Amino acid sequence: MRVLIVKTSSMGDVLHTLPALTDAQQAIPGIKFDWVVEEGFAQIPSWHAAVERVIPVAIRRWRKAWFSAPIKAERKAFREALQAENYDAVIDAQGLVKSAALVTRLAHGVKHGMDWQTAREPLASLFYNRKHHIAKQQHAVERTRELFAKSLGYSKPQTQGDYAIAQHFLTNLPTDAGEYAVFLHATTRDDKHWPEEHWRELIGLLADSGIRIKLPWGAPHEEERAKRLAEGFAYVEVLPKMSLEGVARVLAGAKFVVSVDTGLSHLTAALDRPNITVYGPTDPGLIGGYGKNQMVCRAPRENLINLNSQAVLEKLSSL
């Protein structure tokens, strides 16, 4: 059986889809998946053993110059790649009009998705042949697991979902695996940042632990923040710029991780690493870290200024 997945973004949403593949792989021997995903996240599906082909899409980039000759050529090549296979099922796990119209509609196969009442954007359901009612008040991982089970005709397991990507990195862990922590300090929204003075206080509190701390970054302003956090601490390392796979390898070898609400926090969960995620205004209930050893540290009054380093240290002691 060959199935196409349409789940293009974001990083957390893409990662939250992986346990559904594991369920299907266990329920339907020999099943294989192709996966349409935004080019920036194209490495992620390849880490799962059930994925045979990754089809990158670049809607975010294309829309800036949709009708230019180079972009038209890219869109044509994408359409040809998408339509090269006749699928037993096409599962749109994105639930948005944009992806349904520009991707799902063009694929060959019976199209499954959430119904008008439960899709993220109800109009997206008009593009599906089979519409499934998936209750909203459950974690995003469980919603996707239920969608796959109903689309492919098996019962959703009652056990916790398994991302099944940690093993991809086990044969290539860093030589110092287990000897360091990773602090994920960067996120997209200002109100989801933990103040730098709190990060530095936590780093100072770990001075006698013997653990080294690694700080990844993606953009130049994040590198500058990492340097400020590391200043004066010999046991803190600002990492070089890395690919997503490179960062995943570092996370896979971490003894533990402390993170803000960011896509890399979900990657940590997918890699089964102990993780404390600090939350301010966002509610982790339905979209927070899902997996083994994932702990939430909520800020008083939903403001991360009010979350001190001692509270995070106390959580660390319980990992």
UniProtKB/Swiss-Prot annotation:
One GO term (biological process): lipopolysaccharide core region biosynthetic process
Catalytic reaction list: an alpha-Kdo-(2->4)-alpha-Kdo-(2->6)-lipid A + ADP-L-glycero-beta-D-manno-heptose = an L-alpha-D-Hep-(1->5)-[alpha-Kdo-(2->4)]-alpha-Kdo-(2->6)-lipid A + ADP + H(+); alpha-Kdo-(2->4)-alpha-Kdo-(2->6)-lipid A (E. coli) + ADP-L-glycero-beta-D-manno-heptose = L-alpha-D-Hep-(1->5)-[alpha-Kdo-(2->4)]-alpha-Kdo-(2->6)-lipid A (E. coli) + ADP + H(+)
Record-listed E.C. numbers: 2.4.99.23
Knockout or disruption consequences: Disruption of the gene affects LPS biosynthesis. Deletion mutant synthesizes shorter LPS without the outer-core oligosaccharide and cannot produce flagella, demonstrating that flagella assembly in E.coli depends on the length of LPS.
Subcellular localization(s) per the UniProt record: Cell inner membrane
Chief location of this protein within or outside the cell: membrane
Enzyme class name: transferase
GO cellular component term of the entry, any: cytosol
Keyword Cell membrane: yes
Pathway recorded for this protein: Bacterial outer membrane biogenesis; LPS core biosynthesis
GO terms assigned for molecular function: ADP-heptose-lipopolysaccharide heptosyltransferase activity; lipopolysaccharide heptosyltransferase activity
Membrane topology qualifier: Peripheral membrane protein
InterPro entries: Glyco_trans_9 (IPR002201), LipoPS_heptosylTferase-I (IPR011908), LPS_LOS_Heptosyltrfase (IPR051199)
Binding of ADP-L-glycero-beta-D-manno-heptose, residues: T187, T188, K192, E222, M242, D261, T262, G263, H266
Pfam families given in the database record: Glyco_transf_9
SUPFAM superfamilies listed in its UniProt record: UDP-Glycosyltransferase/glycogen phosphorylase
Function: Glycosyltransferase involved in the biosynthesis of the core oligosaccharide region of lipopolysaccharide (LPS). Catalyzes the addition of the first heptose unit to one 3-deoxy-D-manno-octulosonic acid (Kdo) residue of the Kdo2-lipid A module. The analog ADP-mannose can serve as an alternative donor in place of ADP-L-glycero-D-manno-heptose for the glycosylation of Kdo2-lipid A. Displays no activity with ADP-glucose, GDP-mannose, UDP-glucose or UDP-galactose.
Family in the record: Belongs to the glycosyltransferase 9 family.
NCBIfam families given in the database record: heptsyl_trn_I (TIGR02193), PRK10964.1 (NF008204)
Name recorded for this polypeptide: Lipopolysaccharide heptosyltransferase 1
Upper taxonomic lineage: Bacteria, Pseudomonadati, Pseudomonadota, Gammaproteobacteria, Enterobacterales
Gene from which this protein is expressed: waaC
